[in-house]
Amino acid sequence: MLLIYKNMPLGAVISSHTSIVPVLDRMGIGLGVGEATVEEVCINKGVDVDFLLSILNTFLNEGYFPEKSFQRASKEDVLSYLKSTYEYYLTSQIPVIEAHMSHLELGESTPLHMLKRMVGNLKSAISSAMENDSKMDFDASDEYCQTAISLIDDVKSLIIKLISGSYNKNMCYALLFFLSSFHKDLSHHLRIRYRVLIPMMK
């Protein structure tokens, strides 16, 4: 298990684990970190370093459970992270899916209409998860997150099984790869909720 520690240069960590870039962004940390350590960047950005390490290590390691000493973040920090995660999905991920769909060159086919309806349902599920988390109704939010993951699987399945004939193959493949990445991110988000965020709220 490869863990991130506060004395590690954050730039080197990002270079080894580029998948954490969106997670860092949700915490208010962008690129351009220079040679600063994880702790130095957190101090500069006003981020709780232990909270960040809990999030990142849980994101990267399926078998990781945060140390009790890490579970000190405020309720405001947790709710802010949850909100920024959903906003990232709604303002970054979903629009990318919609943009890919618009370039599939499917015309006004039945599969395209089905895809649009599924993506609309995906957007609604994520919006509902965000709303319920803001009310601290975490069980309801978990259900909406699971629904979102199932919808991503449904979109992938529809593309694989129903799209045929003349279409933009490169864009279709890119969409499948992107959906797989989105599925992985959402699954990691659920793991972080169970192991880090919700325990901090109790």
Question: Each predicted region: which residue ranges?
Answer:
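Small-residue-biased structural context
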Residues: 1-202
